[in-house]
A protein has these predicted regions:
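PRPP-associated nucleotide enzymes
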Residues: 1-165
């Protein structure tokens, strides 16, 4: 895409992170009545997952990539039949979220939904079938490699947290 959204800078200010997460928590409470566990993908989801977990008084764990694949480490686990909410900082294609879904299914737990500070997905690019609760919805077009506009082709992809084309 022609735009990059970085939540790490916002989340580096504890009071701002707390304020954003309180507001998002209220939306989450309205949408999801029963949450047993919050799962956040590293790196971007760790701070928001922790803040939301603190506010909602829910256990929060994170998954991390090892050899390109999300796994649970550090003694984290997902209990069978638990109701799990996936929380990210930004959702674009939903690819990271769907990788988290695999961990939930493997544990025979139940995915209840997704939440993020920024939802910049579009129906065209989204791989998620469930509704996303977000603080902000931003419409930013994304492109497949073979459909990339000429003005973007010359710009190297060097943004932290992004997946390379």
């Amino acid at each position: 895409s022609s735009k990059y959204i970085q939540c790490a800078k916002l989340l580096s200010f504890p009071k701002k992170a707390e304020k954003i997460c309180k507001s998002l928590s209220n939306k989450i409470k309205k949408k999801f009545k029963k949450i047993d566990l919050i799962l956040a993908p590293a790196m971007g989801g760790i701070i928001i997952g922790y803040e939301i977990g603190k506010i909602l008084k829910k256990e929060t764990i994170f998954c991390e990539r090892v050899n390109g694949k999300f796994i649970l480490r550090r003694g984290f686990s997902i209990k069978k039949n638990s109701r799990v909410l996936i929380i990210e900082d930004v959702i674009t294609t939903g690819k990271s979220s769907m990788e988290c879904v695999k961990l939930i299914k493997k544990a025979k737990a139940k995915l209840i939904g997704f939440a993020s500070i920024i939802d910049r997905s579009s129906k065209k690019s989204l791989k998620i079938n469930q509704k996303i609760v977000s603080q902000f919805k931003i419409n930013v077009p994304t492109y497949k490699k073979n459909k990339l506009p000429n003005y973007l082709k010359s710009i190297p992809i060097t943004i932290p947290g992004s997946r390379f084309i």
